[in-house]
Amino acid sequence: MAKVGFVGLGVMGAPMAGHLVAHGHDVTAWNRTPSKAEPLRQLGATVAADLSALAAVCEAVFLCVARDEDVSQCLDAMTPAASPGTLFVDHSTTSPSAALGFHQRLSEKGFRFLDAPVTGGSMGARAGTLTLFVGGSKADFEVVAPILQS
């Protein structure tokens, strides 16, 4: 996969995105507090001005934000600019009904979705030892498995 996006650079997302950059992935990142993206820029990531700009250049977008509503708002901002077939991977801890709703909503627009919450806390995120619980199509999982292993 040529270009990946990462949305949400908090306690969990920042180290997760950092591992992607460290493993050689071409990462474009965004955070609602722009200063949180600066350390990632220094590692070699591109920082997008907004979610639309991120979605326009990425084949897969990983989200790690706080709540169902945050995921929904991010998806609303990204889908108009994203290419058909873009794969959205949500690492946020969302409700099962929200995850199903995101999948349905994205599928209807020609996008793909994996629900992939993580466990292991901030220590696991920094160490690169998180456990992921991935729900979605096996084919989509196989596409991003090498990225998730980073």
Question: Can you describe what each PLM-predicted range is?
Answer:
Residues 1, 84-85, 129:
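A general structural motif
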Residues 1-63, 122:
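NAD(P)+-binding Rossmann beta1-loop-alpha1 motif at the extreme N-terminus of oxidoreductases
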Residues 4, 93-150:
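Rossmann-fold dinucleotide-binding core
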Residues 17-19, 41, 73-76, 100-104, ...:
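Short amphipathic alpha-helical segments
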Residues 30, 64, 92, 134-135:
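Active-site-adjacent beta-strand anchor residues
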Residues 42-48, 72-73, 113-116:
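Short gly/ser/thr-rich secondary-structure transition/capping motifs
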Residues 51-112:
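Rossmann-fold NAD(P) dinucleotide-binding segment
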